[in-house]
From Swiss-Prot:
Chief location category: host cell
Name of this protein: Protein M2-2
UniProt subcellular location: Host cytoplasm
Domain of life: Viruses
Family: Belongs to the orthopneumovirus M2-2 protein family.
Annotated signal sequence range: none
Gene assigned in the entry: M2-2
Length: 90
């Protein structure tokens, strides 16, 4: 099984996440500032993000963003290649 395809738009760093759109043939889910993006897992470089820390308040580098999004997707159970993930950043 391969991981979902992840697209970052626009491709610029450092960045803040504006929205995450998860799509498949029968499902579309969007996470944005209105339904705030919470993530309470450890990221690979051992920085802990508080459950109240929103994605859009963190300035991401390229690899940190990819690693954290993959952990977030695993947390949601989105681990199959039937999904395409669009990360909108500013």
């Amino acid at each position: 099984m391969t991981m979902p395809k992840i697209m970052i738009l626009p491709d610029k760093y450092p960045c803040s996440i504006t929205s995450i759109l998860i799509t498949s043939r029968c499902r579309v889910t969007m996470y944005n500032r209105k339904n705030t993006l919470y993530f309470n897992q450890n990221n690979p470089n051992n920085h802990m993000y508080s459950p109240n820390q929103t994605f859009n308040e963190i300035h991401w580098t390229s690899q940190d963003l990819i690693d954290t999004i993959q952990n977030f997707l695993q947390h949601l159970g989105v681990i199959e290649d039937i999904y395409t993930i669009y990360i909108l950043v500013s």
